[in-house]
Curated annotation (Swiss-Prot):
<protein>
    <recommendedName>
        <fullName>Glycogen synthase</fullName>
        <ecNumber>2.4.1.21</ecNumber>
    </recommendedName>
</protein>
<comment type="similarity">
    <text>Belongs to the glycosyltransferase 1 family. Bacterial/plant glycogen synthase subfamily.</text>
</comment>
<dbReference type="InterPro" id="IPR001296">
    <property type="entry name" value="Glyco_trans_1"/>
</dbReference>
<dbReference type="Pfam" id="PF08323">
    <property type="entry name" value="Glyco_transf_5"/>
</dbReference>
<comment type="pathway">
    <text>Glycan biosynthesis; glycogen biosynthesis.</text>
</comment>
<dbReference type="Pfam" id="PF00534">
    <property type="entry name" value="Glycos_transf_1"/>
</dbReference>
<dbReference type="GO" id="GO:0004373">
    <property type="term" value="F:alpha-1,4-glucan glucosyltransferase (UDP-glucose donor) activity"/>
</dbReference>
<dbReference type="GO" id="GO:0005829">
    <property type="term" value="C:cytosol"/>
</dbReference>
<dbReference type="InterPro" id="IPR011835">
    <property type="entry name" value="GS/SS"/>
</dbReference>
<keyword id="KW-0808">Transferase</keyword>
<comment type="function">
    <text>Synthesizes alpha-1,4-glucan chains using ADP-glucose.</text>
</comment>
<dbReference type="InterPro" id="IPR013534">
    <property type="entry name" value="Starch_synth_cat_dom"/>
</dbReference>
<keyword id="KW-0320">Glycogen biosynthesis</keyword>
<dbReference type="GO" id="GO:0009011">
    <property type="term" value="F:alpha-1,4-glucan glucosyltransferase (ADP-glucose donor) activity"/>
</dbReference>
<dbReference type="GO" id="GO:0005978">
    <property type="term" value="P:glycogen biosynthetic process"/>
</dbReference>
<keyword id="KW-0328">Glycosyltransferase</keyword>
Amino acid sequence: MKVLSVSSEVFPLIKTGGLADVSGALPIALKAFGVETKTLLPGYPAVMKVIRDPVVRLEFPDLLGERATVLEVDHEGLDLLVLDAPAYYDRPGGPYLDPLGKDYPDNWRRFAALSLAASEIGAGLLPGWRPDLVHTHDWQAALTSVYMRYYPTPELPSVLTIHNIAFQGQFGSEIFPGLRLPDHAFAIDGVEYYGTTGFLKGGLQTAHAITTVSPTYADEILTPEFGMGLEGVIATRIDDLHGIVNGIDTDVWNPATDPVVHTHYGPTTLKNREENRRSIAEFFHLDNDDAPIFCVISRLTWQKGMDIVANVADRIVAMGGKLVVLGSGEAALEGALLASASRNPGRIGVSIGYNEPMSHLMQAGCDAIIIPSRFEPCGLTQLYALRYGCVPIVARTGGLNDTVIDANHAALAAKVATGIQFSPVTETGMLQAIRRAMHFYADRKLWTQLQKQGMKSDVSWEKSAERYAALYSSLVSKGM
């Protein structure tokens, strides 16, 4: 089977979040199930800088008003189609934001162009290759199925994956003519959304199947609390909605071989984590004692529950724990966490910014990780933690709920528990979970059991890729 994947970011070329990890790992995992994937992504400067010996495969003299070229290149196991359109993508800043952190005002055109190019490739415009199905990711690629629906070309089966429904790609009605869609596409069953132009909304109306990145999140987005205004649209597509949890690259995330981990280990050699633990204490200037080290590796935002972490940091120390934080985000939260570190020298350490090697070492050396997200479509951090024997303490939401088995009495007795869940996401809820963790930590046999069971969890892409392959086959066989 041939699949065209369309994404605004793909790891390892360009990444701002989990979307890139999925769009970079899933095509490789799908190979085992006979799925040949070409991935279309924008030619940002970061992408153009690293690709080698690309081949020109297609030219668009007028892609929504600008010239564009499709380049094909193999990169670290990925078959990439790079949309080289300098007018859209060759600019400073990130994929979506300018150097001042503001949305590019023409983001609607930049990603409509990506979707239009994808629809043309889906229609067979790429010489010698035509996909059987198109798989699009988030609002930036969601118009692909809209173009395929309204353009006079054969319509292919399509899948739209929602990685985070909070990001919807909503723009004013005045941009609609620039999309070059027929007038009747600006309607309730098209892209019109309360008088605006909704990219994700249009994709939800026109894709043949919709997936989210965990089963719980698929249920949550049907509710007003999590649906972000689109729950009504999604409810009309409930029979086409599937929750498929993400996996991780278990070669990159492997404590037995990870090059940045100071001492390698596995489920039977957990004592080797001690050297990594000492490295963490040294980096964050912590006292060298046996108190449990809790860590946070996160964007410092309200959605991630970081205001709660900031508010309880002193109390974690008072309870006998230590805390280390790696991340960046809202200035007020950064300041609050730095202040807590100043008040608690040797017990709290904070590093503002993101450091990929340090994130690996923290998973390999800290005792537990706190993930108190108010909503979390899937989450990858807890999967890394399970893999590394860093016991996850998670809010009972989204993919966190699907991937961490709470250490309740029944799960402990059955020896299947892998972490600690808590709800509601409040200071009291989090502190109760941390208190439970410290109780378990005091019983080293029980704590080791939690670590080992977590490390045995299958967090690879294999099961997820198998489900995607089955979904693809179902749609293609139905001729959707």
